[in-house]
């Protein structure tokens, strides 16, 4: 993880797309993630990666799936803005599924960017809600005074530097497919 890039004010800080993924596709990703097995999610800090339950207490599974990654990018690309004079080039190879059960959350933070050896770097966070919850679990953006409610198949793309949090799930289980959009 790197430093935080400034927000590109010429582009929307947040894009929401309903029905981005079908309920059947969402269910398949959840089944595959459960079969892979979840672990406690860690956080990448400047001095290293560690589990920090005071900041984050959800579970995560990380995997690579080239066909899923390609499908996600092809669906997203027409909706993605140029940022800092660069264009979208693809998604991170490492896909993550997050699972939030009642009481689990991720406190307010910014997503760090990653730079590849080819010079491309991540600038946007990609999140697809794979499930809905009965209560809680919103993704909260304090600077926008806006919360996004989990809805099966809803995609959210936002600039890495946009402050956000996953509010605690109260009832139900929230699953999110997470990646990063690389730019060149």
Give the label of every model feature segment.
Residues 1-125, 129-155, 161-184:
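Fe(II)/2-oxoglutarate oxygenase catalytic core
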């Amino acid at each position: 993880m790197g430093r935080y890039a400034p927000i590109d004010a010429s582009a929307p800080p947040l894009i929401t797309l309903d029905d981005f993924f079908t309920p059947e596709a969402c269910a398949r990703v959840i089944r595959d993630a459960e079969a892979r097995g979840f672990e406690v999610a860690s956080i990448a800090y400047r001095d290293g990666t560690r589990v920090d339950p005071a900041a984050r207490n959800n579970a995560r599974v990380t995997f690579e799936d080239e066909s899923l990654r390609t499908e996600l990018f092809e669906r997203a690309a027409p909706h993605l803005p140029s940022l800092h004079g660069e264009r979208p080039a693809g998604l991170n190879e490492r896909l993550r599924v997050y699972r939030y059960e009642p009481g689990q959350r991720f406190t307010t933070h910014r997503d760090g960017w990653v730079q590849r050896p080819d010079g491309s770097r991540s600038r946007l966070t990609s999140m697809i809600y794979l499930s809905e919850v009965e209560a809680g679990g919103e993704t909260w953006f304090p600077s926008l005074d806006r919360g996004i409610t989990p809805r099966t198949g809803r995609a959210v793309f936002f600039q890495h530097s946009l402050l956000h949090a996953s509010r605690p799930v109260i009832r139900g289980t929230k699953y999110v497919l997470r990646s990063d959009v690389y730019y060149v």
